[in-house]
Amino acid sequence: MPADEMLIRQLKQSDYPALVELIRRTWYAQQADGNTDGLEPTCDARHRNTLAWHLAAIDAYDCLARTTYAAVVERNGRIIGVILGSVPAKVTRMQILRHRWQQASLALPMLANRAGRNGLREQLAILHADRALIQTTGNDYQAEIVLFLVSPEAKGQGVGGRLFAHMLDRFHALGIRQYFLFTDTTCDYGFYEHKGLQRAGVRNLALAHGEQLQCFLYQGRVNDKER
């Protein structure tokens, strides 16, 4: 593969550390750390035993627990984008249990300190907001885009557009016509509106230190203009 050429391929288990690191850089880079000595370290020694990394890993396993297809963009041997999709009918019980066990093994030691408890509490609040959004719509969607991330240095280079189109092609091949995704004000949700998705729900969430977060549910149809 020529230098600087982008390759879209399926996510492999060996990519999980890179997935966690991308989540950490996107949402937890400013996370204040507590003492997490003794927890399993990241492959990146600079962030070893950090609260931010463990919260990111918990997020990753939460997403993987319901993912049925995942793809990454690789350039020069480095993952610069990832997208996870789910067709609920294809999610297995063993898959859910395997990833929930990983989540629990990461979360339990974090209960021993205040920073860890606060981080977990915030994650749960967002998950509850997402569940409330899906219940409010009353729709039984065929598929979900579970996670969609592009590394900061790769934004504006067409990486996100290619990844998004790749997932929609996958949905199309499976006969999926309608899908949804969760997003919030920490994300570039304007991308989804540009792709033709419609906002189907919004929920306001109060976080620590008086911060406010708006959580959204967007829905789209395969074969509409977002493809």
Regions found by a protein language model. Name each.
Residues 27-70, 75-76, 132-134:
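Active-site rim helix/loop that mediates acceptor-substrate recognition in acyltransferases
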Residues 72, 78-87, 128, 132, ...:
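Conserved beta-strand in the GNAT
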Residues 150, 156-169, 194:
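Conserved acetyl-CoA-binding loop-helix of GNAT-fold acetyltransferases
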Residues 131, 161, 185-202:
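Conserved active-site alpha-helix within GNAT-family acetyltransferase domains
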Residues 146-148, 152-155, 180-190, 205-209:
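Conserved beta-strand-loop-alpha-helix junction that forms the acyl-donor binding cleft
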